[in-house]
Amino acid sequence: MLAFFVRRLASLIIPRRASSRFATALILLGTLAAPAFAHETLKLDAPKPQLAPTPPMGWNSWNKFGCNINEALVRKQADAMAASGMKAAGYQYIVIDDCWQKSRDDNGNIVADPERFPGGIKALADYVHSKGLKFGLYSDAGSLTCGGRPGSAGHEFQDARQYAKWGVDYLKYDWCHTGTRDAEAAYTIMAKALRESGRDMVLSICEWGNNQPERWAAPVGHLWRTTGDIYDAWEGKKDWSHGMTNILDMQVERWRHSAPNAWNDPDMLEVGNGGMTTTEYESHISLWAMLAAPLIAGNDLSTMDADTRRILTNSDVIAVDQDPLGQQARRVWKEGDLEIWARPLKGGEHAVVLFNRGKAPAAITVRWDQLNLPAALKADVKDLWSKKVAKNVRGSHGGTVASHGVIMVRITPVL
């Protein structure tokens, strides 16, 4: 017990971005007092498993359902992912967000809410796995989760072992009720716990970009949030949440910090939740694909309409997101409400989005020199939404872009 209290003391007295050496010293003091916890230091002995060579794809319960979740709902989402074409398109994780927890038992083990999840988490994970999918859970680095359920602070290794027994493949780890804990130290402890659990698990760092995760998160987690939560709107701010284009603007300079197995995460998709138009949802997923963002659907998969399914399963757009080169797009041009975003792809190809934030249709053209390509280069240009292909294009490519819309193309040099 002394080890636990010393570790908690460290989390309370060390300010954010403070020296991790001091944190390590305090935690080691606690471990010396209790040899059973001697492995609970900040040092990551095991390398980060290569579980996300491309951005993770899946579904998460929070955007649509919040705390209104239960076992039957999650099973229904798994059924829909497997049957709707989502699984075939590359989506694989079913992630239960906050409010699945109820309490801890007398031994400190985390207990699922028995009314919402009467069959238990292990049986639910087994069901998801039976569909050829992977299973994810949520926890928090604080004493409580954002929804007021038990957090993992002081129980990191115990919880990680429990997750492994249940068959968890993915952990979203939030940042509520953390007081003055140092984010790097807190997430490193959970990363170490997961790596020592005996099961590979993706670690999704969710501290909202408040603690400069681009400086420390790459060796620790597989993806890290860059902003507060998204909400289902074209633009705006609501409490700690941001509209889609507001979050996009926060990604402009982050391309330097994204790479395979270490992804910037601008938060989940809102496609199909009703707060934006079909055109805006096409822009949403197109821009997230350009950002090499995790594609985590946040709608009700069991009731989605044909347009939502079409948008979420566009194989050409998904292929850009999942390109193995893993380079996040840069905004290479902006004039008023008009923008061009571009990213190189493996094999010398390029993906480009012509983006119109304005209230009226507008002409936008990308020049080859903006892509560091010679003007004389011939290329085939495929529109990833209309599926039309322009052959042997030289120098530039453009079109009229709808209000709040995109033209997204893949440019393939003709050899």
Which residues fall in each region the model found?
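C-terminal beta-strand-rich structural cap/linker in extracellular carbohydrate-active enzymes
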Residues: N392-L415
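Aromatic-lined carbohydrate-binding/catalytic grooves of carbohydrate-active enzymes
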Residues: Q77, M81-T180
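N-terminal module-boundary/linker segments of secreted carbohydrate-active enzymes
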Residues: H39-E71, R75, A80
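Structural recognition of the beta-strand scaffold that forms the well-ordered cores
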Residues: P55-S61, G90-D97, K134-S139, D169-D174, ...
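Carbohydrate-binding surface patches
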Residues: W288-L291, I296-G298, K334-L373, H404
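Glycan-recognition surfaces
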Residues: H155-Q158, R195, D200-D300, D321
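Bacterial N-terminal signal peptides
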Residues: A23-A33
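Bacterial N-terminal signal peptides that target proteins for export
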Residues: F5-A25
